[in-house]
Amino acid sequence: MTRQSEQILENELVKQLQSLGHSFVEIRDEDALVANLKSQLEKQNKLKLSDKEFAKVLNHLNKGNVFERAKILRDKMQLTKEDGTSVYIEFLNQEHWCQNQFQVTNQVTMEGVYKNRYDVTLLVNGMPLVQIELKRRGLEMKEAFNQTLRYKRHSFASGHGLYQFIQLFVISNGVNTKYYANNKDQSFKQTFYWSDKDNKKITQLKDFANEFLEPCHISKMICKYIVLAETDKILMVLRPYQYYATENIIE
C-alpha cells in the first residue's frame, strides 16, 4: 500500500467535497468561525443581525454539554430585535434538510488547554457539525479516533464552544473510513462502516465521501437519523441497515 501524506489526502477530500456541493470557506481561527456563523445564519434566516443581536445568539448557543447543544441546534431561538420586533432564528432546517447552507473548511486552529488544528470540518448554516480526521494511508484508524478524543478534551470547549455542536465524526486513513456520533464517553466499538443498499461496505474515503458526505445526505443523517436518547443523554446515529430499513418504510 502506498503511503499517502495526510496533506494530499486532505486536499483531495476538500476538492471532492466542493464538487459535491459544499462551498469552500477559509476559516483559520475562532474569530473567522464566528464571523462566518453570523453571515450564514443571516443568509439561512433571510435577515440581518446587529452586533448586539448576534451577541444574544452566541450567548444562547454557548450553553450545556454536547447533548444539550444537540437540542439547541434542533430548536429555533426566539430573538427580540433592537427595534422591539420578535423573530425566530433557525439553526438547522430539519424538515427540508437539503435547504441549509453547506460549507467545508480545513485546518481550523482552536486554542484551549492546548492549541489544536483540525483537519476537515463540514459546516451547516455556519455551525461546525461534522469533523473529519485523517491519517495517512497505512496508519491505524484508532490513531485518528484518539486524535478526536484529544480535540474534545483540549480545545472543543474553547471560545464560544461552537465545536461542541459537532454531531458526527468521520475518521479515515484513505482505505478505511468510519463514522460515529459525538458523545461524552466514546468507544472505538461505537464507530461504524457505511454500506450500500446491498450491505456492501464502503471503506474507501473517496467512495464514502460520494455516498455519505454529499450535502443532502449528511444533512439528512443529522436531521433524521441521529436519535437524541433522553435516558442516557447521548446521541445515537443509525447504522446502515437501520437507515435503509427506515428509508424503505418511508418510501
Where are the model-predicted features located?
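ATP-dependent helicase/translocase motor core
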Residues: 2-251
